[in-house]
A protein has these predicted regions:
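Single conserved hydrophobic/aromatic residue that forms the stacking wall/gate
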Residues: 1-11
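Short, charged/polar micro-motifs that form catalytic or ligand-binding hotspots
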Residues: 144, 194, 359, 363
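Basic, alpha-helical terminal appendages of large translation-related enzymes
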Residues: 5, 14-16, 20-23, 27-49, ...
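Active-site cores that bind ATP or allylic diphosphates and position pyrophosphate for catalysis
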Residues: 18, 31-170, 175-182, 190, ...
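Catalytic adenosine-cofactor/nucleotide-binding cores of aminoacyl-tRNA synthetases and other
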Residues: 149, 161-316, 378-406
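Hydrophobic alpha-helical segments in the ANL/AMP-binding
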Residues: 8, 126-128, 373
Length: 406
C-alpha cells in the first residue's frame, strides 16, 4: 500500500496476494506431471551440492544433471519426498519477442530442469508467476532485464500448457551515479525512502518515467499525459543513472505549482505518517502561511522544517545564535515589544514603520533589527522573511517569545 501511495495510488484493481492462490498453482503442477512436462526428482541435498561443486571445479555454470528426468517411479527410493521439476526442452531454442530489447534467444540446453514444487509442497516463483499472470489475463509482463532467464522458463511453461503467451518487456535496471546497481544499502532505493523525505508522488512518477525515455523536449508530464504519451518501445536499452539532485528539482517544481489547498493536504498526511500529529490551531497557521513556507522547499521535510517555529512551543537558541544577541540587540527587541504593544492592528502595514523607526533610531540596517527578531522567534538566523514570521505567529505569541530573552 505504501508503494501505491508513494506513486499516487492510481491502481484501482484489488491487491493480489500470490500465497493465497497456492491451490491453483499445485493443480497446474499436477497437470504438468500428467502431461509428461514435469517429473519427480529424488536427488538428495548432498547429491545436488556435489553436482554444484563439480561444476565449480570445472568452472562451468551449474545445471542439474536431469538424473530423474526419464526414470520410472519404481526406481524411487523409499521414504524420500521428491521435488517436482519442469521438464525443460533440450533441443532447439526459446525466443522472447521483447518490446524493449528486441528479439532475444537462448539455446534450450542451457535451461535447467528447474524446480516448480519444493519438498514441503510450496510452488516456486516461476510456476506461481506464470499461473497468476494467466489467471489474471495479463497482456504485458514488464520487469527488470535481470529477469530474462525467468522469462525463458515461463515461456516454456506457457507452451507446455498451451496457454496464450503475454507480451514481455525487460527494462534496464536503474544504477547509481557511479554506475552500480541500486541496492538496499543505498539510502534511497525504495519508494518508502522517498516518501520519508517528502518526495511527492507526481514528482517521483514524472522522474521515473523520464529515466531512459523521452517525448520530444517535454520534461513535465501530468498523470493524464503520462498515460497518453508513454510507450514501452521508447525505452532505451542502457541502464539509467539515478540522480537525486534531479529528483529534488522535479519535486521543487511540483511543490511550487501545486495549489496551497492540495499541498496542505499532502503536508498534513506526510506529518501524520512520518513526523507528528500537529494540533488544529497550528495546522491552520501553517495552511495560511504555505505561500512563504514552501518558498525554496524541495521536499515536504523542508516545509516541515520551515514550519518548526510554528509547531514548537519552546524555541531552542543555540550558542552560536545566542552570541549574536548583544545588549544592543536586546535593547532593540525591548523597544520593538513596547511599540508592538501599542498597536491595535497587527499586519505588515503597521509593523513596517516600527521596524524602519528602530533602524533609524539605532543607526543600523534591516539585518540589525531583523536578525535578532528572527533568532528569538525561530531559533535560527536563517529562514522565512521576518514579516512573514511575525504575522504568522500573531501578536500574542510574538510578545511571549520575545519576553523570554532578557
Amino acid at each position: 500500500k505504501s508503494r501505491s501511495r508513494g506513486l499516487g495510488d492510481v491502481y484501482k484493481r484489488q491487491e493480489y496476494i500470490q500465497s493465497k492462490n497456492i491451490e491453483s498453482h499445485i493443480k497446474v503442477v499436477n497437470k504438468l506431471l500428467e502431461t509428461g512436462n514435469a517429473y519427480k526428482c529424488y536427488c538428495s541435498s548432498d547429491e545436488i551440492e556435489e553436482q554444484k561443486l563439480r561444476a565449480k571445479q570445472k568452472k562451468i555454470p551449474y545445471i542439474y544433471n536431469r538424473k530423474w528426468r526419464d526414470k520410472s517411479e519404481i526406481e524411487a527410493p523409499q521414504d524420500v519426498k521428491p521435488v517436482i521439476r519442469f521438464k525443460s526442452k533440450i533441443e532447439g531454442s526459446t525466443k522472447i519477442n521483447d518490446l524493449v530489447q528486441g528479439d532475444i534467444e537462448i539455446e534450450n540446453n542451457t535451461i535447467e530442469d528447474f524446480i516448480i514444487l519444493r519438498r514441503d509442497g510450496t510452488p516456486t516463483y516461476n510456476l506461481s508467476a506464470s499461473v497468476d499472470d494467466h489467471i489474471m489475463d495479463m497482456t504485458h509482463i514488464i520487469r527488470g532485464d535481470d529477469h530474462k532467464i525467468n522469462t525463458f522458463k515461463q515461456i516454456q511453461i506457457y507452451e507446455a500448457l498451451q496457454w496464450e503467451k503475454p507480451l514481455f518487456a525487460h527494462i534496464p535496471l536503474i544504477h547509481t551515479l557511479e554506475g552500480k546497481k541500486l541496492s538496499k544499502r543505498d539510502n534511497a532505493s525504495t519508494i518508502d525512502d522517498y516518501e520519508k523525505i517528502g518526495i511527492m508522488p507526481d514528482a517521483l512518477r514524472n522522474y521515473l518515467m523520464r529515466l531512459g525515455w523521452s517525448y520530444k523536449d517535454k520534461e513535465i508530464f501530468s498523470l493524464e499525459e503520462s498515460i497518453k504519451y508513454f510507450n514501452l518501445e521508447g525505452i532505451g536499452k542502457s541502464p539509467s543513472k539515478l540522480d537525486m539532485s534531479r529528483i529534488l528539482s522535479m519535486n521543487e517544481y511540483y511543490i511550487k505549482n501545486k495549489s496551497n489547498d492540495d499541498l496542505f493536504q499532502s503536508f498534513e498526511e506526510y506529518c501524520k505518517n512520518f513526523k507528528e500529529n500537529i494540533n488544529n490551531e497550528k495546522l491552520n497557521i501553517i495552511k495560511k502561511s504555505l505561500t512563504f513556507l514552501k518558498n525554496k522547499a524541495k521536499t515536504m521535510e523542508d516545509i516541515y522544517n520551515n514550519s518548526k517555529f510554528i509547531i514548537n512551543d519552546e524555541i531552542i537558541i543555540e550558542k552560536a545564535e545566542m552570541s549574536l544577541l548583544t545588549e544592543n540587540a536586546k535593547n532593540i527587541i525591548k523597544s520593538f515589544m513596547k511599540k508592538v504593544n501599542e498597536i491595535e492592528v497587527f499586519n505588515k502595514e503597521t509593523l513596517e514603520p516600527i521596524i524602519n523607526n528602530l533602524i533609524s533610531e539605532n543607526q543600523t540596517n534591516f539585518k540589525g533589527v531583523g536578525q535578532p527578531l528572527r533568532i528569538i522567534l525561530t531559533g535560527s538566523k536563517f529562514g522565512p522573511g521576518i514579516y512573514d514570521i511575525i504575522i504568522s505567529l500573531g501578536k500574542k505569541r510574538v510578545l511571549d517569545r520575545l519576553s523570554k530573552v532578557g
